[in-house]
Amino acid sequence: MVCEGLQWLSGGQAGALQASKSAISQARSRLGPEVMKQLAARVLRPMARPDAPGAWYRGWRLMAVDGSCMDVADEAVNAEHFGYPAASRGQSAFPQARVLALVECGTHAVVAASIAPYGHSEVAMAAELLPAKLAGDMLVMADRNFYGFKLWQKACASGAKLLWRVKSNLGLPGQHELADGSYLSTVYDSDDRTRRSGQQVRVIDYTLKDSATPVQDSYRLVTNILDPEAAPALELAALYHERWEIESVFDEFKTHMRSASTVLRSKTPELVEQELWGLLLAHFAIRQLMEQAAWRQGLDPDRLSFVHALRVIKRKMPQAAAIPP
């Protein structure tokens, strides 16, 4: 809209300056990925205001951590750097890059991210990313593939509250049953054979039954919120399913932002990483505009359509390009 207002400077005659594909490619190569990574580190942040609907639970900012993979161009250098995922027959058609993201559930804003080859584990990536990005006002949710004593301990040390699903075979003997049906237990490092350096957790077991079938899904959550009055088990069980907001975020920048393209176009690992940081920054910019629009109307940003916002921005882009630099 700002650019539309400036069109009078050129008498409405400004023409878009078209750069060739070769010029863009050369400029991207000169820029490299590190600048984009540093820019993301400075720009990506939580954006929910204290009164934002759907973004908070009892004073804690709702966050989720998860990972996803993206196909990259099937070039030899990309294949060597990123690697292929396993397939039932042979190997996948494309190498894949792994992206780990810390997301603010209420606004769908990616507040921190990490990019690595396919073979890197999400747990190792989280251990490197989370300690510096978590804060004491956060309640962070994660699925059962993330739990490990060392990562749990690192995340707890940040001061953040955690609500993580764990696998059903994790030994969590009850030590004290609480009034809300949850119970206290202690987790240990698998290397701690003497079991002297454990960490107390609160365990919440529950099942979800599909009304259409007799099948029940069992869930086991652990949290470092030990006081049931501060966060009752029933509320935490319901809250955990807000973690699925992060799946929508991955769908937004993997599918909607890239239209029909399912494979990143960059031909080298450096440019793949640069492209991914660019996508993350563009996604943040869109989500920030949506948050501002929702806040003015007192709405939950979930009420707004990401696809519609993206279309509006795309319609404005040619007008912005019409203003010479």
Predicted regions and their residues:
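A short, well-structured juxtamembrane/interface segment
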Residues: 45-52
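Short hydrophobic/aromatic segments of transmembrane alpha-helices and their interfaces
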Residues: 7, 53, 233-234
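Short secondary-structure boundary/capping segments within folded domains
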Residues: 14-16, 53-54, 91
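DNA-recognition alpha helix
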Residues: 1-15
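Major-groove recognition helix of helix-turn-helix-like DNA-binding domains
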Residues: 14-31
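Single, function-defining residue in the core of a domain
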Residues: 1, 28-31, 38-42, 57-61, ...
